[in-house]
Amino acid sequence: MASDKKSEGFQSGAGLIRYFEEEEIKGPALDPKLVVYIGIAVAIMVELAKIFWPP
């Protein structure tokens, strides 16, 4: 019967499960909020530079 047959599915057939199991985190781990705050700070500095920097 079909219900007794165990299928591996598309992911294991394509090797995707093995790929995601071997994934390593490289580089510094940053909090997502910190990345947003840094982006906002850089945007503010750019806008202030446009205002105060002599053309």
UniProtKB/Swiss-Prot annotation:
UniProt-listed InterPro entries: Preprot_translocase_SecG (IPR023531), SecG/Sec61-beta/Sbh (IPR016482)
A GO biological-process term: protein transport
Classification of source organism: Archaea, Methanobacteriati, Thermoplasmatota, Thermoplasmata, Thermoplasmatales
Cytoplasmic face residues: 1-31
Gene from which the chain derives: secG
Topology of this chain in the membrane: Single-pass membrane protein
Extracellular side: 52-55
Main function: Involved in protein export. The function of the beta subunit is unknown, but it may be involved in stabilization of the trimeric complex.
Subcellular location: Cell membrane
Record's keyword terms, sorted: Cell membrane, Membrane, Protein transport, Translocation, Transmembrane, Transmembrane helix, Transport
Entry similarity comment: Belongs to the SEC61-beta family.
This protein's name: Preprotein translocase subunit SecG
Keyword Protein transport: yes
Domain of life: Archaea
Subunit-level organization: Component of the protein translocase complex. Heterotrimer consisting of alpha (SecY), beta (SecG) and gamma (SecE) subunits. Can form oligomers of the heterotrimer.
Cellular component per GO, a single term: plasma membrane
Transmembrane segments: 32-51
